[in-house]
Curated annotation (Swiss-Prot):
It is found in: Cytoplasm; Cell membrane. Its EC number is 1.8.-.-. Residues 425-596 form the GST C-terminal domain. One of its GO terms (cellular component) is cytoplasm. NCBIfam families: O-ClC. Monomer (soluble state). Interacts with dopamine receptors DRD2, DRD3 and DRD4. Channel activity is redox- and pH-regulated. Inhibited by IAA-94. In the soluble state, catalyzes glutaredoxin-like thiol disulfide exchange reactions with reduced glutathione as electron donor. Can insert into membranes and form voltage-dependent chloride-selective channels. The channel opens upon membrane depolarization at positive voltages and closes at negative membrane voltages. May play a critical role in water-secreting cells, possibly through the regulation of chloride ion transport. It is an enzyme of class 1 (oxidoreductase). This is Chloride intracellular channel protein 6. InterPro entries: CLIC (IPR002946), CLIC_N (IPR053823), Glutathione-S-Trfase_C-like (IPR010987), Glutathione-S-Trfase_C_sf (IPR036282), Glutathione_S-Trfase (IPR040079), Thioredoxin-like_sf (IPR036249). It comes from Mus musculus (Mouse).
Length: 596
C-alpha cells in the first residue's frame, strides 16, 4: 500500500526561460541574409550573444532532459513530472509559487532566479545540445546585434504565457492527465531521485538528453498507479472495518465458542463444536478457522505488507516496550506488533547449513490479543504454543493479533486463519496439533530438549476436565447447577488421582518403603512436557473463572491438583505466557451468565 509522501515540488517560474517558446521576433527572418553566409565567424559569438530566439529555442530543447542538473529540484513547468501546479509564471502566477513554497520550502526558488543572465544559460544549453551530436538550430535573428535584454525577456514571458494558456507546450498538455490520475495535491516526487543540485547552480543542461524525460514519464505512471492502489486498499480497509463491526460478537460468545473448540480438540470431533455452541451455523464466514477466535469470525481484508515496510524499523523499536498488535499499520505493522525476541537475541556468527542442529531459525508466533488490543489474550491454544517454544529454548518472536481490527497483512500471510499460528523460516503453520508435532521433530537434541512424555497416560490425563467446566459455567438453571458441578468434580478427582499416583520410575524396587503418593511436580515427572503445555492453560482458566462467576474452588483435599498448579506458578515458562486474570474474566463476562 503506497504511502502518501511529502511531494517535493518546485516553485513555478524558477526556470530562467519560458518553456517550449520558439520566439523568432517579427520581421527578423530577413536578418538571416545579412553579411551573406558568414556563419563560421558568428558561430563563436553565438553562445554569448544569442538573441531571444536562440535562447527560447534552446530552452525548448532542454525541456525533455534537464531534470537532474537543475537547481530547482528536477523537472519544472515544462515537464509533466511535477504535476499541474508547476506551470509557467504566465499561467499559474504567484498563488502557485506560494503553494509550492508551503509544500517544500527548501525546494522553492526565489523569483529572482528568473533574472539569471541569459547569455550564461544559452551557453550551457548550446553545449548540451552539441554534446548529443545534434546541430543547434540557429534562427535568423541570432546574427543580428542583441537588443535590449529587458525588452527581449519581457517579450518572451508574454508569448510563453500565451502558449501556456493555449496549451501549446507538450508538458502542459500532459499535466491535466497527471492531475486527473493522481488526484488533488498528489504530485509525484522528483522522479530522478536523490539530490538534484543546489539553487546556486546555473540552469544550463550540460548533460541534457531526451532520455530522462521518458524515464520521468514512466516514473510518474508507476507512482500514479501506486496511488490508485493505495486508494483502493484504503477503501477496502474501510469497508472491512465496517464489516468487522457487523460481524463482531461480545465476550460471552467468544468464551462460549472457545470452550466448545477446546472440547472439540480434546475429543477430536469438530462436529461436537456445532452441537455445543449452536452458533456456528449463524456465522457469516464459516470458512474462517482458529481455536481462539471465538465467535469473532472475521476475515481479514485484502492487503499486503508493502504498505508497512517503510515503517518496520520504527514499529520494531516501539514493540520492545509494550505488547501490541501486528500486523500494518506499517507493517505498521496495522495488524499487530512484535513483543520482541524471547530468550534473548540472535548472536552474530557464521552461517550454518540447513539441517544443522545448531542452526538458528526465524520463528514468529501469532497469538490472540486481549480486549485492549495489545496484551496477550485469553486463549489456551496460544499459550500452549508459547510455552512449547519457550521450553525449547529457541529464539522466537511473539506478535499479538487484534481480531477486531482485522489486520490486513494477515490475509496474505495466513488467509482465513485466526491465531494462534506460526511462521517457521518463512513457512506458515496453522494447525495447533501439527505445529506441536513439527516443533518436536524439528527442534531436537542436543541443542533443543525433547518435550514428549515418557508415559503415554500423561497425555490423556485431565482431557475431559475442560469440557465439564464449559457445561458448568454456561448453565443458567439453578436446579441443574448441582449436576454440572458434580460432573466437573468427578473429572477433577480423576485428574487428582493420576497426579497423586506414583509413576513407575518413582517406585524403587530395592527400597523397603512403598511409595503411595507421588511427589512429582508435573504430569509426567519433574519437568514440563507437551502434556503440561496442553493442560495447564485450561486448568488455570477453570480456576479463575469458576471462582469469579460461580464461587467454585478446587477442593483443598485435591492435593495433587494444588501441588501441580503451585509448581507451575513457580515456572517462568508458564507464568510469563499466562494472560492476565482480568483478560480471562473479561472473556467469560457474558458467557458465565447468572443462574435463574
Amino acid at each position: 500500500m503506497a504511502e502518501a509522501t511529502e511531494p517535493k515540488e518546485v516553485a513555478p517560474g524558477s526556470q530562467g526561460q519560458p518553456e517550449g517558446a520558439t520566439i523568432e521576433g517579427p520581421g527578423e527572418p530577413g536578418a538571416a541574409d545579412l553579411e551573406g553566409r558568414e556563419a563560421s565567424e558568428e558561430a563563436a559569438e553565438a553562445p554569448r550573444d544569442l538573441g531571444a530566439g536562440v535562447e527560447a529555442r534552446a530552452s525548448g530543447k532542454e525541456e525533455g532532459g534537464c531534470g537532474q542538473d537543475e537547481g530547482t529540484g528536477g523537472a519544472q513547468a515544462q515537464d509533466p513530472r511535477t504535476g499541474p501546479e508547476a506551470e509557467t509564471p504566465g499561467a499559474s502566477g504567484a498563488p502557485g509559487e506560494a503553494e509550492a513554497a508551503e509544500r517544500d520550502p527548501e525546494g522553492a526558488i526565489p523569483q529572482g532566479a528568473e533574472e539569471a543572465p541569459s547569455a550564461q544559460q544559452v551557453q550551457g544549453m548550446s553545449s548540451g545540445l552539441d554534446s548529443q551530436g545534434e546541430a543547434p538550430e540557429v534562427p535568423g535573428d541570432s546574427r543580428r546585434e542583441p537588443e535590449d535584454p529587458t525588452a527581449s525577456e519581457a517579450g518572451e514571458e508574454a508569448e510563453s504565457g500565451q502558449e501556456a494558456q493555449g496549451g501549446g507546450a507538450l508538458g502542459l498538455q500532459i499535466n491535466p492527465e497527471v492531475q486527473g490520475l493522481a488526484g488533488d495535491n498528489m504530485d509525484t516526487e522528483a522522479p530522478a531521485g536523490g539530490p538534484l543540485g543546489s539553487e546556486s547552480e546555473p540552469q544550463g543542461g550540460g548533460e541534457s538528453s531526451p532520455q530522462p524525460q521518458d524515464e520521468a514519464i514512466e516514473i510518474v505512471t508507476t507512482e500514479i498507479g501506486g496511488n490508485e492502489s493505495g486508494e483502493l486498499a484504503g477503501a477496502s480497509a474501510a469497508d472491512a472495518a465496517g464489516e468487522g463491526e457487523t460481524l463482531g460478537k461480545d465476550g460471552s460468545e467468544e468464551a462460549a465458542s472457545e470452550d466448545a473448540r477446546v472440547d472439540a480438540h480434546e475429543n477430536g470431533d469438530q462436529g461436537k463444536l456445532q452441537e455445543e455452541t449452536g452458533e456456528e451455523e449463524a456465522r457469516p464466514e464459516p470458512e474462517l478457522k482458529g481455536p481462539c477466535e471465538g465467535a469473532i469470525q472475521e476475515k481479514p481484508p485484502d492487503g499486503s505488507l508493502d504498505g508497512e515496510e517503510a515503517k518496520s524499523t520504527e514499529h520494531e523499536e516501539e514493540s520492545q516496550a509494550e505488547l501490541s498488535n501486528h500486523l500494518a499499520e506499517e507493517p505498521s505493522v496495522q495488524g499487530g506488533e512484535e513483543l520482541g525476541r524471547v530468550n534473548g537475541r540472535r548472536e552474530n556468527g557464521p552461517a550454518l547449513e540447513e539441517g544443522d542442529p545448531g542452526q538458528e531459525h526465524d520463528i514468529t508466533l501469532f497469538v490472540k490479543a486481549g480486549y485492549d488490543g495489545e496484551s496477550i489474550g485469553n486463549c489456551p491454544f496460544s499459550q500452549r504454543l508459547f510455552m512449547i517454544l519457550w521450553l525449547k529454548g529457541v529464539i522466537f518472536n511473539v506478535t499479538t493479533v487484534d481480531l477486531k481490527r482485522k489486520p490486513a497483512d494477515l490475509q496474505n500471510l495466513a488467509p482465513g486463519t485466526n491465531p494462534p499460528f506460526m511462521t517457521f523460516d518463512g513457512e506458515v503453520k496453522t494447525d495447533v496439533n501439527k505445529i506441536e508435532e513439527f516443533l518436536e521433530e524439528k527442534l531436537v537434541p542436543p541443542r533443543y530438549p525433547k518435550l514428549g512424555t515418557q508415559h503415554p497416560e500423561s497425555n490423556s490425563a485431565g482431557n475431559d476436565v475442560f469440557a465439564k467446566f464449559s457445561a458448568f459455567i454456561k448453565n443458567t438453571k439453578k436446579d441443574a447447577n448441582e449436576i454440572y458441578e458434580k460432573n466437573l468434580l468427578r473429572a477433577l478427582k480423576k485428574l487428582d488421582s493420576y497426579l497423586n499416583s506414583p509413576l513407575p520410575d518413582e517406585i524403587d524396587a530395592d527400597s523397603s518403603e512403598d511409595v503411595t503418593v507421588s511427589q512429582r511436580k508435573f504430569l509426567d515427572g519433574d519437568e514440563l512436557t507437551l502434556a503440561d503445555c496442553n493442560l495447564l492453560p485450561k486448568l488455570h482458566i477453570i480456576k479463575i473463572v469458576a471462582k469469579k462467576y460461580r464461587d467454585f474452588e478446587f477442593p483443598s483435599e485435591m492435593t495433587g491438583i494444588w501441588r501441580y498448579l503451585n509448581n507451575a506458578y513457580a515456572r517462568d515458562e508458564f507464568t510469563n505466557t499466562c494472560p492476565a486474570d482480568r483478560e480471562i474474566e473479561h472473556a467469560y463476562s457474558d458467557a458465565a451468565k447468572r443462574m435463574k
